């Protein structure tokens, strides 16, 4: 339901851009982030959890963005944007001798967002952000070794889609010639992913990403 509301808001903002004066923003973003994940492994489709793993990793990454800025009034703008992160990072790693060790990695993350912005003065503005993120998910390094219980799987690597909602707040400083600098904090809550291997063992992983980002861009 929340995803539908976000998509509806982005679509409505695009329609509104035809009515109000607007401009285009482009730029790049550098982020310091924390990725926390938890996972479980079940013995089979109806079994209880036998393995739990948690991971907390700090990292840095860069992205590029393009935006349409809708100037609704002297004090309020709405920005519709798309951000691309050419990243690959581990989301979860589950280990053990039960025949279903696996590494879960995410990459090529796209985020579509709406950014309502309140203009404090000619130099400073503050904003909130809500969006939807989607990326590639790879499940690889799946254990296929023989075990005493005969529980080894015969799986190959799997590709899935990683999706989640994004929320954030930030501030922007406007400079000369349309250049701006932003500082923002965002949180992405990814949907739980689920994978069942060839002998009915079930892997689930839940991930959350927090970013502190510095952006430099230009308006045209």
PLM region spans:
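Bacterial N-terminal signal peptides
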Residues: 8-14
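Gram-negative outer-membrane beta-barrel domains
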Residues: 2, 18-220
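Sec-dependent signal peptide recognition
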Residues: 2-8
